[in-house]
Regions:
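Short S/T/G/P-rich N-terminal loop/turn motif that feeds into the first structured element of a domain
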Residues: 1-70, 74-93
């Protein structure tokens, strides 16, 4: 399984979330299969987007596209950190 972990600050969570939700169709078309949105315990505008993808190549192409750069700018995203991850193990305790 392939995952992407993105950590970034946003100027306004509600505005960011609306744009994030509006982009659901294009994220799905690009290969995103599921996601979590998490928020920092001490900073409501520091967001983590953790998602499962059909392939890392598709995820990279999507997140590095000019269209997504513009969407992030409109959403008020500041300095995103992208981590492209391969699953090694999963368990339940």
């Amino acid at each position: 399984m392939e995952y992407v972990l993105i950590v970034h600050a946003v100027k306004d969570y509600k505005a960011w979330k609306q744009i994030f939700d509006d982009a659901a169709v294009i994220r799905k078309k690009a290969g995103e299969q599921s996601y979590y949105v998490l928020r920092d315990e001490n900073d409501a505008n520091r967001i983590v987007h953790f998602s499962k993808w059909s392939s890392l190549a598709r995820a990279k192409a999507f997140f590095e596209s000019p269209r997504l750069v513009e969407i992030r700018r409109l959403a008020g995203v500041e300095a995103p950190e992208f981590n492209y991850l391969h699953s090694l193990e999963q368990g339940t305790l």
